[in-house]
């Protein structure tokens, strides 16, 4: 491996709030893929960390799913804050200071399997900034109660303990600890972490724009507004697309830390030839959630099936809108040609029997499923939304204006009725997907992390 392709010597972790296959869509695929990239670039046993409060039993099942699916090499690479608190909490026994609950604040007690109180968490109902409040978190240890400065203090104390573990194992008390933060709420909570041995790198997974997500000058509010105010605090910020990086830099400024490294996919075996597929089968693969606007595809379908009577639309994925979408299918009278299949573990097999991949999404950070479909040789019909479809599709598909049902219908009809055009687009698909292969993306990610490591911490005082 060339020096430029290898990470600087340090310990590396990726950190999210919750990372769960089947619950967190493409995010739960992209994060462990980044973990693998780190290891391939020379990181020593990088970890995937989470801070959600599900039970240890739920976390154990989620970890096993990552291992069984080939996403993470072994369960020991995944750790959770609350699992470790419930197993004793002694790693935080030296954190914080003696004390108790903050007066006037409601608390929730977390207990272990034996009923012993382990930690007391402040509760802030309907407060979007709960993670930034300073009310004490109380950790019960064998040496007595310790208080930490809110959830920020809790997260930092846990990460400090892991960093110290790794330093002790390496025999180097000054070893750098690099946290690749995958969740904005967590990133916000870490900007006061001023240890000069820590580097904080933040990745982006979605559009920062408010609905309807197509105006780069629209007022940015809520979580995104708060997060953008913290841009200067990160040692590197990794955007999934050039378009989003450029629009954010133009509007909010680039502190000299912006990089682009898309989420990766595995290319897999060579796809089936276009002629061997069901020529009139269209497939969608996404969460059944408002962002994905599957309703637009369903509304476009009556015109498609009128023009191509044997056309079939297979929709794979689950989510809160499943019943609503099924009702729409029934209302439009297309239940014979539109099927909501639910989640599938046979993604490639589904792609290999289809002729066209369709997404009618309202916005994206990158659109990982587009790259996955391209890797299987599928032409893509996508709404031309910010961000990702335009950069991914290239000359391997058709982009249509967001929200235009007639344009969706016309694009699908045009491809389903033109075998030659489908074959032409399919021939370009694999090359388009190659831009998202690990070997293509790794140099950009390494460059971002190298820049962070080779400069002093932006938070050190």
What do these predicted ranges mean?
Residues 343, 362:
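Aromatic "clamp/platform" in nucleotide-sugar-dependent glycosyltransferases that forms part
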Residues 394, 398-406, 414-420, 434:
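Conserved acidic donor-binding segment of nucleotide-sugar-dependent glycosyltransferases
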Residues 280, 284-303, 308, 313-315, ...:
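A conserved mid-protein helix/loop that constitutes part of the nucleotide-sugar donor-binding site
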Residues 379-383:
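Short hydrophobic beta-strand element within catalytic cores of glycosyltransferases
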Residues 438-461:
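C-terminal alpha-helical cap of glycosyltransferases
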Residues 243, 264:
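Carbohydrate-associated surface elements
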Residues 163-167, 207, 216-237:
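Membrane-proximal helix-turn-helix segments that form the acceptor-binding/catalytic region
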Residues 350, 414, 421-435, 444-447:
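A short, well-ordered alpha-helix in the C-terminal region of glycosyltransferases
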